Curated annotation (Swiss-Prot):
It holds the Pfam family GDC-P. One of its GO terms (biological process) is glycine decarboxylation via glycine cleavage system. The keyword rRNA processing does not apply. Its EC number is 1.4.4.2. The lineage of its organism: Archaea, Methanobacteriati, Methanobacteriota, Thermococci, Thermococcales. Belongs to the GcvP family. N-terminal subunit subfamily. InterPro entries: GcvPA (IPR023010), GDC-P_N (IPR049315), GDC_P (IPR020581), PyrdxlP-dep_Trfase (IPR015424), PyrdxlP-dep_Trfase_major (IPR015421), PyrdxlP-dep_Trfase_small (IPR015422). It is an enzyme of class 1 (oxidoreductase). This is Probable glycine dehydrogenase (decarboxylating) subunit 1. GO terms for molecular function: glycine dehydrogenase (decarboxylating) activity.
């Protein structure tokens, strides 16, 4: 007897009869025999339970950061995520309501994204925020193109520090190759920060000037206000990239004179997850000239025909809904679920929690830096947040291999990006870094070096 839900031969025979065939082999009669008669190098099929056991055996080879302490930062960090964040974003109202072509139907998702925008605006000190980009790198690249558009193409130069995160710099170069925007890099000084004198020589006719908080070496740029003033005096827009977990303990980029702020929202509420997905921050001043040139989607609050509060996608004429050549951006979606997770985490922390988070990271980074200075050279003096640059006399790859043997994941090798730094690596700490992990790292380094 045929059953609608269990595979059986009755259904198969019925379908074959309908198309006038007597066997499955006849379906593939047109394929030359030499291609279908050869034995495939495949194992015998397994039951679902057997597959489960095999997959579990493979997965057990992985090690979490709790089983193997990691100091590998350089843009991806282990942060603690409160349990309720995952629980809330897994609700079907969020998990399945990808912004549709009639977005006003999903009022809950639009409101959540509006709250994300509002929270980020408060953090970065600029009033207008979009509902996210793909990541920090794409946000920075879109900011560069935006500054060129704002100058109506008369200026096609974007100035960035040489010590911008190398992968973000790669994304920027990819984005700007087609529009033929010139990327000019500014050297760092003896303290590992932007060389202001070099900037003054290169800023002429620039559409925008970019700087990061903290920079790739983990250092806080002490002359960031001056960098902004130099940019504005040259008629360029000032773009600041920021790790938002620091914003509880430093001035907001908007207060430092930034016209555009970009960054990485996924440091809140989202796991490392092999580096993605992420959500890029994009914020601008309250200037319609800038707002109309923003990339991505903006969620606005208004009233419907009955006078009730409603959330909408606003200023959509900037987007890909119009002719492609006229659109400010052709990023076709945002990272909505990642942004909602970030919003939930930020709201849960509140102003006091955000400040305490920054203070703990700063304290842990300082301890890591102090202990690392006992075994290696710290080439740049200054205040570090998360990342610390360390230089060794011995090839770092050898050191790293030895650390792995001792169940410790070392720092990120930067010598391939900046050969002039020698055998250097970035070691990172966050609020999750434990004192005993750092002590174990130093003990291991003393053995290895």
């Amino acid at each position: 007897m045929g059953n609608h839900y269990i595979p059986n031969s009755a259904h198969k025979e019925e379908m074959l009869k309908e198309i006038g065939l007597s066997s499955i082999e006849e379906l593939f009669a047109d394929i030359p025999e030499k291609f279908i008669k050869e034995e495939l190098n495949l194992p015998e099929g397994k039951s679902e339970y057997e597959v489960f056991l095999e997959m579990n055996e493979i997965l057990e080879k992985n090690k979490t950061v709790l089983e193997m302490p990691t100091f590998l930062g350089a843009g991806t960090y282990f942060h603690y995520i409160p349990a309720h964040v995952k629980h809330l974003i897994e609700r079907s109202e969020f998990l399945t309501s990808y912004t549709p072509y009639q977005p006003e139907i999903s009022q809950g998702m639009l409101q959540a994204l509006f709250e994300y925008q509002s929270l980020i605006a408060e953090l970065v000190g600029l009033p207008v925020v979009n509902s996210s980009m793909y990541d920090w790198g794409t946000a920075m690249a879109e900011a560069a193109l935006m500054t060129v558009r704002l100058h109506k193409g008369k200026r096609k130069k974007f100035v960035v520090p040489k010590h911008t995160h190398p992968e973000r710099l790669q994304v920027l170069r990819t984005y700007t190759r087609g529009p033929e925007v010139e990327i000019v890099t500014v050297n760092w000084n003896e303290r590992g920060q932007v060389d202001v004198e070099d900037l003054k020589e290169k800023v002429k006719d620039a559409a925008g000037v970019y700087i990061e908080i903290p920079n790739f070496f983990g250092l806080l740029e002490e002359e960031i206000r001056e960098v902004g003033e130099i940019a504005h005096e040259a008629g360029a827009y000032f773009v600041v990239g920021v790790d938002p977990t620091i914003l509880g303990i430093v001035e907001a980029p908007g207060e430092l004179g930034a016209d555009i702020v970009v960054g990485e929202a996924s440091y809140f509420g989202n796991p490392m997850n092999f580096g993605g997905p992420r959500a890029g921050i994009f914020a601008v001043k309250n200037d319609m000239k800038l707002i109309r040139q923003m990339p991505g989607r903006i969620i606005g609050m208004t009233k419907d025909a009955e006078g009730k509060r409603a959330f909408v996608m606003t200023l959509q004429t900037r987007e890909q809904h119009i002719r492609r050549a006229k659109a400010t951006s052709n990023i076709c979606s945002n990272e909505a679920l990642v942004a909602v997770a970030a919003a939930i985490h930020i709201a849960s922390l509140g102003p006091k929690g955000i400040r305490e988070l920054g203070e703990v990271i700063l304290k842990n980074t300082a301890y890591l830096k102090k202990r690392l200075s006992e075994v290696a050279e710290i080439p740049f003096d200054g205040v570090n947040f998360k990342d610390v640059l360390v230089r060794f006399d011995k090839p770092y790859r050898e050191i790293h291999e030895e650390l792995l043997k001792r169940n410790i994941h070392g720092g990120y090798y930067v010598g391939s990006h900046f050969p002039e730094l020698g055998e250097a690596a970035l070691f990172a700490a966050t609020e999750t870094t434990r004192k005993e992990w750092v002590d174990a790292l130093i003990s291991a380094l003393k053995e290895v070096i």
